[in-house]
């Protein structure tokens, strides 16, 4: 299980997350520059979605096998981190 931390104080924000990967599992860190697109679609895991016309630069980190990102932050300071959710409830209930 991963741990995520978020702290807000005044006009400052702190975000932290660990990945809980095996010591032998590779993690990739990638910097994507801001771009302007002309209406393409993006292939996500299970569907196509419209591509935003303009994107901000973003720094992302993920295990090599993952599509997308596990941890990241864009040039506007928006941070993301994914978490597994474990439940004893029935799927779809």
PLM feature segments, named:
Residues 1-92:
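A contiguous strand-loop segment
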């Amino acid at each position: 299980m991963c741990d995520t931390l978020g702290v807000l104080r005044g006009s400052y924000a702190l975000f932290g997350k660990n990945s809980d990967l095996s010591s032998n599992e590779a993690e990739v860190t990638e910097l994507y520059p801001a771009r302007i697109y002309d209406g393409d679609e993006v292939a996500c895991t299970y569907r196509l979605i419209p591509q935003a016309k303009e994107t901000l630069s973003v720094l992302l980190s993920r295990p090599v096998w993952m599509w997308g990102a596990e941890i990241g932050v864009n040039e506007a300071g928006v941070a993301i981190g994914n978490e597994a959710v474990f439940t004893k409830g029935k799927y779809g209930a």
